[in-house]
């Protein structure tokens, strides 16, 4: 027997399988300021105690495996293991629990969302002892946040670049999303920007397809926004989608956008991946480009209520990885509770500090120290009648994006943009005068439509679609 084997035997190593809770359930643990804290919604299999389920999550997402191993003795598990330190039942749900897990910071590579997620939302989500598992929230410690660049520029720098203050920004996704030639696509961009919007957007599906290669689209869109800028005297932007099949092609597109002198590019951060997104965000800061983020594929991850990951976690991850805008949903037409939840993660995107507030879905107090904020983008099924609600709900630091609500105007693209800009300016002026947008919203829009025929036509075409506060 070798000396090493004798040493291990003498300290009582015993092969076999033991309950996770014996090692990883530690209700007496006091969390550290440097710990990453996670709140998991755990649905154990029948017969599995919640303490064992919570401990299994902590183990399988940190140092644990299914059996005792010799090499446990070659490191300090107390230093590196995750710990399930608190469990509470979910009100109104049978056999569901919120399990709180603390992870030592040394488990994670600095500045890598990819590595953080590989551990925390990795193989543990397929663990047989659990019927379902959902990551509801994360507390990112300041010590870890400071290893990330974060958003390339942030809200204030973007406003300074665009010279636009005191109101939400207006955007429009060009439709149809697929099938237009580059020249016709550029024409639509020009008409909408000339009509008064601040931004137009590539649809997330638009990369470099046979009907419209990326370089042609970039050239025609750049020509369109420069022409619109010259006519309106305002700085304009088009979200040029740099998402590609390889990081090399993505960077090639970002470099060409910079050479054209446009102000902003775009990335699909979930389908493109966090490594690609962080790479692009670093390039954007170094080269003065704003970065618009689309969340295509998010519903695959966050739609189920008891499995996957809540979007607030994806939003926090984006703020670490880097982006100046991100789509956040519209809130319009949602139930009141859902509105509070949505505005909870909107505040997590924008604010420097957010207090714990379970009614808004915020499980942990979160400080972002000097990390710039991200503008939430409200888009999807909105039109001029929604403008008072959107202005009231999202405030100035947001992007309100009307696709069909611009391009569906009966008189064409430019009048559709005019209608949205007039509606927004009317709502902002009314708010600044102290009027209540929640109660007087429809009246404000009707008053503005009396001197704007474009807005009057938009009001008529969408009058049957109502928003209820």
Swiss-Prot record:
Residue(s) carrying N6-carboxylysine: 201
Reaction(s) the record says it catalyses: 2 (2R)-3-phosphoglycerate + 2 H(+) = D-ribulose 1,5-bisphosphate + CO2 + H2O; D-ribulose 1,5-bisphosphate + O2 = 2-phosphoglycolate + (2R)-3-phosphoglycerate + 2 H(+)
Keyword Plastid attributed: yes
Subcellular localization, as worded in the UniProt entry: Plastid, Chloroplast
Cofactor: Mg(2+)
GO molecular function, one term: magnesium ion binding
EC number(s) given by UniProt: 4.1.1.39
GO biological-process terms attached to the record: photorespiration; reductive pentose-phosphate cycle
Note describing how the cofactor binds: Binds 1 Mg(2+) ion per subunit.
UniProt PTM comment: The disulfide bond which can form in the large chain dimeric partners within the hexadecamer appears to be associated with oxidative stress and protein turnover.
UniProt modified residues of type N6,N6,N6-trimethyllysine: 14
One Gene Ontology cellular component annotation held by this UniProt entry: chloroplast
Residues involved in Mg(2+) binding: 201, 203-204
Leading EC class: lyase
Residues where substrate binds: 123, 173, 177, 295, 327, 379
Primary location class: plastid
Marked site (Transition state stabilizer) residue numbers: 334
Active site: 175 (proton acceptor), 294 (proton acceptor)
Propiece residues: 1-2
Sequence positions bearing N-acetylproline: 3
Keywords carried by this UniProt record: Acetylation, Calvin cycle, Carbon dioxide fixation, Chloroplast, Disulfide bond, Lyase, Magnesium, Metal-binding, Methylation, Monooxygenase, Oxidoreductase, Photorespiration, Photosynthesis, Plastid
InterPro entries per UniProt: RuBisCO, RuBisCo_large_chain_AS, RuBisCO_lsu_C, RuBisCO_lsu_C_sf, RuBisCO_lsu_fd_N, RuBisCO_lsu_N_sf, RuBisCO_lsuI
Main function: RuBisCO catalyzes two reactions: the carboxylation of D-ribulose 1,5-bisphosphate, the primary event in carbon dioxide fixation, as well as the oxidative fragmentation of the pentose substrate in the photorespiration process. Both reactions occur simultaneously and in competition at the same active site.
Complex and partners: Heterohexadecamer of 8 large chains and 8 small chains; disulfide-linked. The disulfide link is formed within the large subunit homodimers.
Family listed: Belongs to the RuBisCO large chain family. Type I subfamily.
Protein name: Ribulose bisphosphate carboxylase large chain
The organism of origin for this protein: Atriplex patula
């Amino acid at each position: 027997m070798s000396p090493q084997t004798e040493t291990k035997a003498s300290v009582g190593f015993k092969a076999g399988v033991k309950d996770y809770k014996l090692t990883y359930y530690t209700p007496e643990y006091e969390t550290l300021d440097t710990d990453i804290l996670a709140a998991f919604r755990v649905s154990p299999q029948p017969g599995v105690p919640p303490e064992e389920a919570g401990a299994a999550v902590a183990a399988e997402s940190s140092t644990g495996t299914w059996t005792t191993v010799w090499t446990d003795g070659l490191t300090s598990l107390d230093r590196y293991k995750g710990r399930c330190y608190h469990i509470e039942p979910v009100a109104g749900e049978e056999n569901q629990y919120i399990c709180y897990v603390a992870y030592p910071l040394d488990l994670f590579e600095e500045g890598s969302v990819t590595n953080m997620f590989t551990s925390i939302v990795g193989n543990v989500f397929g663990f047989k002892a659990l019927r379902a598992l959902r990551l509801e929230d994360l507390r990112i410690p300041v010590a870890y946040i400071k290893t990330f660049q974060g958003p390339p520029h942030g809200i204030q720098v973007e406003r300074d670049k665009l010279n636009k203050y005191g109101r939400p920004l207006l955007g429009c996704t060009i439709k149809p999303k697929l099938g237009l030639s580059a020249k016709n696509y550029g024409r639509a961009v020009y008409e909408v920007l000339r009509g008064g919007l601040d931004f137009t957007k590539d649809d997330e599906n638009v990369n470099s397809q046979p009907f419209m290669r990326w370089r042609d689209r970039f050239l025609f869109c750049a020509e369109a926004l420069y022409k619109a800028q010259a006519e309106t005297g305002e700085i304009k932007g088009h979200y040029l989608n740099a998402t590609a099949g390889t990081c090399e092609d993505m960077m090639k597109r970002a470099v060409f956008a910079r050479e054209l002198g446009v102000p902003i590019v775009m990335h699909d951060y979930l389908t493109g991946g966090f490594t690609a997104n962080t790479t692009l965000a670093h390039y954007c800061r170094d080269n003065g480009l704003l970065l618009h983020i689309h969340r295509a594929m998010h519903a695959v991850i966050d739609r189920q209520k008891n499995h996957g990951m809540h979007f607030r976690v994806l939003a926090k991850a984006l703020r670490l990885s880097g982006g100046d805008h991100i789509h956040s949903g519209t809130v319009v037409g949602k139930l009141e509770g859902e509105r509070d939840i949505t505005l909870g993660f909107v505040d997590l995107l924008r604010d420097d500090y957010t207090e714990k507030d379970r009614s808004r879905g915020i499980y942990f107090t979160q400080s972002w120290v000097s990390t710039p904020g991200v503008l939430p983008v409200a888009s999807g099924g909105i039109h001029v009648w929604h403008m008072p609600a959107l202005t009231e709900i999202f405030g100035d630091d947001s992007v309100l994006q009307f696709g069909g609500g611009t391009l569906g105007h009966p008189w064409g693209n430019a009048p559709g943009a005019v209608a949205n800009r007039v509606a927004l300016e009317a709502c902002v002026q009314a708010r600044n005068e102290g009027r209540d947008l929640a109660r007087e919203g429809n009246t404000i829009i009707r008053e503005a439509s009396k001197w704007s025929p474009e807005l009057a036509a938009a009001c008529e075409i969408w009058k049957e679609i109502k928003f209820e506060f």
